């Protein structure tokens, strides 16, 4: 069908002539996951901490989409859009791939291979997961993605803001032209891997505050310098190449001593607490998904389902006939069916189409 054709075209495009200036991110832009992220970014807003109104993290699933939306607006409408989606809260697909890989997966060696590599790995895995585990993709998942962005950008900004250069002689240990692209993900992974077993970051607090605590910043100040010292001792290898090796991360993780401060540990929460929040979010999302499925079925109308029932009567089980009959009743009355009965007709459609 159409979906198979779309997937085939995208698959061919991924292996097309590499001379064409098409990135991995461009090829993944129409994947359902990125469409979902775009929709979620427009409706799930952050609390007004830095701003006077709730604001969104605009997810740009295709290039220049943020700019194109602004071109349609004028005057007060444009001001409202920029107030709701400030430029500093713009996030694109490559950035999400980097942030997710660095923070959620703790794989600094993958991040060090560059945005295209990270995008291919992230894009392929996440597209498959989105197809098979849809309830995983919920408000809490979105919030964690944004928290990952906040963590990554906070460290990046810290190095950029304090860097020592000929124009701005700060005396800071990080110099202009340093290995920031490697220091940031390695710092994140080092801090997070040192969290005691059974504990985790308070993702909800980071989302609510839209910033990191002073205790977290203290760890960043210590570990960024430690990370720089470690990667610069690259045993004769080019530092950027050294950072791409999984063995480099494993060595840093297991052999370089580091214990988070007491104040940082105190801010952590039990892993079970975050797991409970995650499970609740999955349940809520499953209900939303089931409701949407039911609505989609009702929208097809009673005539569609009556025709299907007539055409496939010899192929449809008694249970499936009962489900379709219920959908017909619901389509007629406008009432929403239960999620249990709402699932069966989609199976029936595939049986009849295959006949």
PLM ranges: what are they?
Residues 1-3:
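Active-site histidine-anchored catalytic micro-motif
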Residues 19-23, 43-48, 110, 133, ...:
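Short secondary-structure junctions and interdomain/linker hinges
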Residues 146, 160, 165-168, 174:
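Non-catalytic all-alpha helical scaffold/repeat segments
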Residues 5-157:
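C-terminal catalytic or substrate-handling cores of phosphate/nucleotide-
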Residues 167-173, 177-181, 185-355:
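Charged, low-complexity intrinsically disordered segments and flexible loops
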Residues 16, 155-159, 188-195:
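Hydrophobic, Leu/Ile/Phe/Ala-enriched alpha-helical segments that form helix-helix packing faces
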